[in-house]
A protein has these predicted regions:
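FMN-binding flavodoxin-like domain, especially the glycine-rich phosphate-binding loop
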Residues: 192, 202-240, 244-247, 289-303, ...
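Active-site neighborhood of phospho(di)ester-bond hydrolases with catalytic His/Asp-centered motifs
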Residues: 66-68, 90-98, 118-121, 180-183, ...
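Short, Lys/Arg-enriched N-terminal segments with co-localized hydrophobic residues
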Residues: 3-17
């Protein structure tokens, strides 16, 4: 009776694992996992909606896994894998990118499957050693651009994409079904809420999380992204399977066009992001005046962010979306507001461009905050400054209000002229 119960239990576990796996094709299965417990990505980017670690297995004459998962999620991953392949052996694990959220399964796979080979490029095998994952020479297959890995029916080839977003990053392309396993490219924050494919999901949420992922993780690397987009432009793609987020099996051109815009730091649509730092409320009042006037002028997409509350990752996502940017700050020991300073530093590091910028702020005796924003703007030649910086001393007077209204009008004029 106990033996029968154990058999039933094992059968139930396999049935649940199979239910949580999803077929992309009859012989290609998603065996990824959702992580809803993780609080911050790389210890600094909040994950309010969690994240998914996508992994895929191809069932052919040879069995091949494409990318693993975070080590802490190996339990769910291996249950899905075993339920999918049964008692067959895994022949290959392709590592498109060696960060721990993709390479966390390698050590366990090497122990479980005695003949498995780790497939990666020379740099990936080298960097794995730095991450304490030492692959024996007889268990490593080093591939180069457009090498072929023959699984039987499926023939896989490889596209190196250095600095998208690590030097060893690459994509795997299934020449049989025209599927691109793109790793972090085309990825997104956010766990999957039932829907696996883009045509099944509410894209409003995922597009925001995809932009937040891109702008913060890949946003600095426009040139390498453009290079890989050019490289892939002649490749027929029926489906994009990234390592995080939704699988794109419809509207492939839509997601590629988004990447082209993001890589060139081109705004997606008309709108203004107003970001401010205020200690006593005066700069807050200035932001509200600007927003109200922009609305009066017919600018519908206006978003105000208090930098003391909004995480910088959300600020970046909004900045990447809209054409207009207005930054306001009080003065804090001759510097900008403490939460505005790191924003300026990161924007400069990422090379923000193709935006209209308005500058405003407040001071009482020494000033310096607005000057810091102006100096930042002057260094970024790809920004077009709108009007002159407005620095108010103390409370906002009627004259100050008129200056702010004029600044908002200048921003609105620019946006309307672009329609």
């Amino acid at each position: 009776m106990i033996k029968l119960d154990l058999l039933r239990c094992n059968f139930f576990i396999k049935e649940v694992a199979m239910y949580k796996s999803t077929k992309i094709k009859d012989d290609i299965v998603w065996i990824g996992v959702n992580d809803r417990k993780i609080e911050k990505w790389e210890s600094h980017i909040p994950l309010d909606f969690g994240v998914t670690y996508n992994s895929y297995v191809i069932l052919d004459e040879k069995i091949c896994i494409i990318d693993g998962v975070e080590e802490g999620e190996n339990g769910d991953f291996f249950r899905k894998l075993e339920a999918t392949i049964g008692d067959r052996q895994v022949d290959y694990i392709i590592i498109n990118h060696v960060e721990p959220d993709h390479s966390g399964s390698i050590k366990s796979l090497l122990k479980m499957y005695q003949d498995i080979k780790v497939v990666g490029n020379a740099k990936s095998i080298s960097i794995l050693k730095l991450l304490d994952i030492d692959i024996p020479d007889d268990r490593a297959i080093v591939v180069k651009e457009k090498d072929i890995l023959d699984l039987g029916k499926h023939k896989l080839t490889f596209y190196l994409m250095p600095m998208v977003h690590w030097p060893e990053s690459m994509a795997t392309y299934d020449t049989t079904d025209k599927i691109l396993f793109s790793n972090d490219a085309f990825g997104s924050f956010g766990a999957l809420d039932g829907a696996i494919f883009n045509d099944e999901a509410n894209l409003n949420i995922f597009e925001n999380e995809m932009r937040r992922y891109y702008s913060n993780i890949v946003g600095k690397l426009g040139a390498p992204v453009n290079a890989i987009l050019k490289k892939l432009s002649s490749v027929e793609i029926s489906c994009i399977c990234p390592s995080h987020g939704l699988i794109w099996r419809k509207d492939i051109d839509k997601v590629i066009k988004k990447y082209q815009k993001w890589a060139n730091i081109e705004a997606e649509e008309e709108g203004v992001v107003i970001i401010y730092g205020s200690m006593y409320g005066h700069t807050t009042e200035m932001a509200e005046i600007l927003a109200r006037q922009l609305d009066e002028r017919g600018i519908k997409n206006v978003q105000i962010y208090d930098s003391s509350k909004a995480d910088i990752s959300y600020l970046f996502s909004a900045i990447w979306k809209y054409k207009g940017l207005m930054i306001g700050t009080c003065t804090h020991y001759n510097m900008a507001f403490p939460k505005i300073e790191p924003l300026l530093q990161k924007l400069e590091n990422y090379g923000l461009k193709n935006r209209y910028l308005g500058i405003f702020g407040n001071m009482l005796w020494s000033g310096g905050g607005v000057k810091r924003v102006k100096e930042f703007a002057d260094r970024l030649t790809g920004l077009e400054q709108i009007g002159g910086p407005i620095e108010v001393k103390g409370h906002v007077t009627p004259i100050d209000r008129e200056k702010l209204i004029e600044l908002a009008n200048l921003m609105a004029d620019k946006l309307i002229a672009d329609r």
